[in-house]
From Swiss-Prot:
Disulfide pattern: none
Keyword rRNA processing in annotation: yes
Lineage: Bacteria, Bacillati, Cyanobacteriota, Cyanophyceae, Synechococcales
GO cellular component term of the entry, any: cytoplasm
Main localization category: cytoplasm
Catalytic reactions on record: cytidine(1402) in 16S rRNA + S-adenosyl-L-methionine = N(4)-methylcytidine(1402) in 16S rRNA + S-adenosyl-L-homocysteine + H(+)
Keywords in alphabetical order: Cytoplasm, Methyltransferase, rRNA processing, S-adenosyl-L-methionine, Transferase
Keyword rRNA processing: yes
CDD domains: AdoMet_MTases (cd02440)
Record family assignment: Belongs to the methyltransferase superfamily. RsmH family.
Gene3D superfamilies: Putative methyltransferase TM0872, insert domain, Vaccinia Virus protein VP39
One of the record's GO molecular function terms: rRNA (cytosine-N4-)-methyltransferase activity
Species per Swiss-Prot/TrEMBL record: Synechococcus elongatus (strain ATCC 33912 / PCC 7942 / FACHB-805)
EC numbers on record: 2.1.1.199
Protein name per its UniProtKB record: Ribosomal RNA small subunit methyltransferase H
Length: 296
């Protein structure tokens, strides 16, 4: 299903670990590849442009990303297909892929477009939905969940040690409808030393809300359970994560799956040059595994 109401020109995502990921899939073999988190299409563009014997199916839950990628990849329209779907719900049928790639987390355009409600630095409705057709919003969680559930959410998904203080302040001051209102309330709930630390005091709470709104960790686990069966023998899966919760799930899933052999004993990290040109790449980690060949 394709979106027709998005504005592709507003969706420009800087791809992280682009060549490391694509080359890690061994694209010289050609064949079909699955881009499970299409985003702005950067990884797929590199694959399609440098390996003409490849074809791509691109998935994304965000219709704005699909629209942007259709524009970016129009030179390869005979070799790429698009589906508006969460990768956890994808059904490949009988197709088997030589490679599967996923670049997880929120994209730069989603952060930068204030109206999406992902950023605590820009005023916007408390939304945070990657798929605008989904029902649950960040406002619903903040305004309707009880204090204990909020604290547990912020602790588990945000790894925030001050989760109880923050949840108490949210309940005391709600309802909240705007991102900056919530951000300021969180900042007021924490000690002054914490308020002016290395990261903004709302960072982890906003991460927790985003993960919950979009069901990110459940979707990732479902995808990791299913994706190895979508690979041809010897095919590879490459996954980029941006925080420890994702990376922990990926590491244990790849190591514990007898359908796969782990290629990267330790995750591949961005170079200093990439971090300097794109500071958001700093926390990225790339892990790669290969589908085990059937026993003869």
């Amino acid at each position: 299903m394709l979106a027709d109401s998005s504005q592709p020109s507003s969706f420009h995502h800087v791809t992280v670990l682009q060549r490391e990921l694509v080359e890690g899939l061994l694209p010289d073999r050609g064949g079909w590849f699955l881009d499970a988190t299409l985003g702005g299409g950067g990884h797929s563009e590199l694959l399609l442009s440098e390996w003409p014997n490849t074809q791509v199916i691109g998935l994304d839950r965000d219709p704005a990303a699909i629209a942007a990628s259709q524009t970016r990849l129009q030179l390869y329209s005979d070799r790429v297909q698009f589906q508006h779907v969460n990768f956890a719900n994808y059904q490949p049928g009988d197709r088997r892929f030589q490679g599967i790639m996923a670049d997880l987390g929120v994209s730069s355009p989603q952060l930068d477009e204030a109206e999406r409600g992902f950023s605590f630095r820009q005023d916007a409705p408390l939304d945070m939905r990657m798929d605008p057709t989904a029902e649950l919003t960040a406002a619903a969680i903040v305004n309707e969940w009880d204090e204990t559930d909020l604290a547990n959410l912020i602790y588990q998904y945000g790894e925030e040690r001050l989760s109880r203080r923050i949840a108490r302040r949210i309940v005391e001051q709600r309802p909240f409808e705007r991102t900056l209102e919530l951000s300021e309330a969180i900042a007021g709930a924490v000690p002054r030393s914490y308020r002016y630390g290395r990261i903004h005091p709302a960072t982890r709470t906003f991460q927790a809300l985003r993960i919950a709104v979009n069901g990110e960790l459940d979707a990732l686990q479902t995808f990791l359970d299913r994706a190895p069966d979508w690979l041809a023998p010897g095919g590879r899966i490459a996954l980029i994560s941006f925080h420890s919760l994702e990376d922990r799930i990926i590491k244990h899933a790849l190591r514990g799956d007898d359908r796969l052999t782990v290629i990267t004993r330790k995750p591949l990290l961005p170079s200093e040059a990439e971090i300097e040109s794109n500071p958001r790449s700093r926390s990225a980690k790339l892990r790669i595994a290969e589908r085990v060949l059937p026993e003869s």
